[in-house]
């Protein structure tokens, strides 16, 4: 594919991260048209939402719309090989290969991969037998982390709680469950652009995953986040590069596994004998809500340049420039999130001062200009500022511009690093 200044771009996904990516790409005069499979109620104002019946249909539509670049930010299409299908059709793709996507698709595969790489991670017990699992937890120290299927991660504090989760998990799938000790420390989300054997780290982010203030309640995909989470030395960043990302890419290359996209490492920083050490918790092979919305405002380069350099395997030609500002994001969620669905609710949105931040539309639908909630994390309030405290104030000011029945959000995002005594 020749370079041009007239790109048709396809984004595969329908959450807040896709809206965030499109919002930035739309500002690039080189982007001729934006298409979405399937998109959401917000993306239809930024481009064209396409009805995609199956993955072969996505390829057909991509050819019909003369797509120059496809960005896949949903997990399932990566796992099922959409990257390879589009590449076979001659389309440039920003997205992990099917084989690389196993790092996120299977907890069992990921733990074995990490162990072989010598990457520091929690010790673990793996089984698909309920009796074996129960025997293990009877002799284990709590809290424990139970990982089932690809996304279901639970922190449990007693045997009764663990039993219910194990029973439910092993009834749903033949995939083994992973049981780990809970690692106490400072958690970070580290996102990297990956072009086979090359990578570039984006600003560090801290995701507040628990549903309730004070980090209580169930785990979610993320109730808020802050960036940059640069509270550590350059030495720690080098450890993350050299002890987590480099061994991962070296093994992928040794296994002839192509990867041109995003790798997000969830890391916990633990103090060992007075030295800070990064331990890997999980991998994701795509941009994630809420990290994507939080770190993108810090990237001053045109996003199209990032995607093209990655997809072409030319990261060496990219010199990233990051803003000196801070960003905080707050998820505005439906009443029953994350345990069950909620009835659709009409959204009422007041004007936002764009000097202070912006809104990212997530699980929403739109009909004749009226927005309705269609899922759990409905809208994200993004605040920017010269300090983290200023970014926080702006994020919560913007959150108050949104109204819908049953809306809920955490009011303590950033408490781990700010002096919010009410929640510490």
UniProtKB/Swiss-Prot annotation:
Catalytic activity, reaction form: 5-phospho-beta-D-ribosylamine + glycine + ATP = N(1)-(5-phospho-beta-D-ribosyl)glycinamide + ADP + phosphate + H(+)
Keywords: ATP-binding, Ligase, Nucleotide-binding, Purine biosynthesis
EC number: 6.3.4.13
Pathway noted in the entry: Purine metabolism; IMP biosynthesis via de novo pathway; N(1)-(5-phospho-D-ribosyl)glycinamide from 5-phospho-alpha-D-ribose 1-diphosphate: step 2/2
Ligand binding (ATP): 137-189
BP GO terms, sorted: 'de novo' IMP biosynthetic process; purine nucleobase biosynthetic process
Pfam family, one: GARS_A
Source superkingdom: Bacteria
MF term (GO), any: phosphoribosylamine-glycine ligase activity
Domain (ATP-grasp) ranges: 111-312
Enzyme class: ligase
Stored InterPro entries: ATP-grasp, ATP_grasp_subdomain_1, PreATP-grasp_dom_sf, PRibGlycinamid_synth_ATP-grasp, PRibGlycinamide_synth, PRibGlycinamide_synth_C-dom, PRibGlycinamide_synth_C_sf, PRibGlycinamide_synth_N
HAMAP family, per database record: GARS (MF_00138)
Family: Belongs to the GARS family.
Protein name as it appears in the record: Phosphoribosylamine--glycine ligase
Gene name of the record: purD
